[in-house]
């Protein structure tokens, strides 16, 4: 559960990074610096509509518009994770000294460029403490990893089920 929680924290940080910078971050240390020192705008959005005279149709018509106003800024770490969050712990795979692997890019899906990212933790690293006890299981998944996001598909979901962790 610790690994998947950290993957989800990185996903939330990536989404905040993209909202502020327009693209996902490809360097995990840059993402940590953003969480540590970055700020997120607090935006108030109001949908409004008004009537106007349309010369083509020669009648009153309704026009919808959106008004946005920046109310202030808040530190990324506080906004996403609350006070007392340790940004440096976010990048380490629990129980090891290894770091998560992170990449970002763009793909073209249906003639639209879509920003993508992928964060992964190899099974061999995550389960290093029990790997010797179950060698047959690890031979089957030697090159696989717990992953969130994808560099080939426009998704930010993970390749794992987190139902056990959510029920606690």
Segments the model singles out, each with a brief description of its role:
Residues 1, 12-14, 39, 45:
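N-terminal Sec/ER secretory leader and immediately downstream segment
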């Amino acid at each position: 559960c610790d690994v998947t929680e950290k993957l989800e924290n990185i996903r939330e940080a990536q989404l905040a990074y993209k909202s502020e910078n327009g693209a996902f971050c490809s360097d995990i240390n840059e993402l940590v610096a953003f969480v540590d020192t970055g700020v997120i705008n607090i935006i108030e959005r109001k949908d409004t509509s008004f009537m106007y005279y349309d010369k083509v149709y020669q009648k009153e018509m309704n026009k919808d518009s959106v008004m946005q106003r920046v109310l202030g800024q808040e530190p990324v770490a506080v906004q996403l994770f609350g006070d007392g969050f340790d940004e440096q712990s976010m990048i380490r795979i629990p129980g090891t000294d290894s770091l998560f692997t992170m990449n970002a890019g763009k793909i073209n899906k249906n003639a639209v460029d879509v920003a993508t990212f992928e964060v992964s933790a190899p099974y061999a690293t995550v389960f290093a403490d029990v790997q010797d006890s179950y060698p047959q299981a690890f031979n089957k998944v030697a090159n696989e990893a717990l992953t969130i996001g994808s560099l080939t598909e426009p998704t930010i979901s993970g390749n794992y089920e987190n139902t056990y962790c959510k029920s606690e």
